[in-house]
A protein has these predicted regions:
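DPxDG-like acidic metal-binding loop motif
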Residues: 125-142
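ATP-binding N-lobe of GHMP and related small-molecule kinases
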Residues: 1-125, 139
């Protein structure tokens, strides 16, 4: 099992303009987001994702398929076509994971995975549920 943790952040200045590449000031928080990854052998290769809130309840669950690399394309992640619960979160996660694959072609290359994330803070607080997720995925994909 592989574990990652990233601290949340409290933006002091530039809360919205930072998205347009403006300088901002932030301080890390004690609370953050955990990510646990279990690898296993399964065909077709799959990625089972479960996100827990600070209350321990699942707020997102999705099964993804990892498509094999071809001569012209890297591996890629897609939502399971049979999944009933595809949504914006799933589509955003697909984009993030595929970007990570484009930066490291060996990422998600040969196994199936079970990923569980857990926030230590309420998602509505604005402490960085997305940025801590991206940081954890970056660490995993290195």
């Amino acid at each position: 099992m592989t574990k990652f943790f990233s601290h949340g952040k409290l933006l002091i200045t530039g809360e919205y303009v930072v998205l347009d590449q403006a300088l901002s000031l932030a301080i890390p928080t004690k609370k953050g987001q955990h990510m646990l990854i279990k690898e296993f052998a399964e065909e077709p290769r799959t990625l089972f994702w479960k996100s827990l809130g600070d209350d321990g309840n699942a707020w997102f669950e999705q099964k993804f398929l990892i498509q094999k690399k071809t001569k012209s394309n890297n591996n890629s992640v897609i939502c399971d076509p049979n999944a009933q619960n595809k949504n914006e979160v799933a589509e955003m996660l697909v984009r993030i994971l595929n970007k990570a694959i484009s930066l490291n072609v060996d990422f998600l290359a040969d196994k199936s995975y079970q990923v569980k994330t857990r926030l230590e803070f309420d998602r509505s607080w604005g402490l960085g549920s997305s940025s801590t997720l991206m940081c954890n995925i970056d660490k995993w994909a290195e």
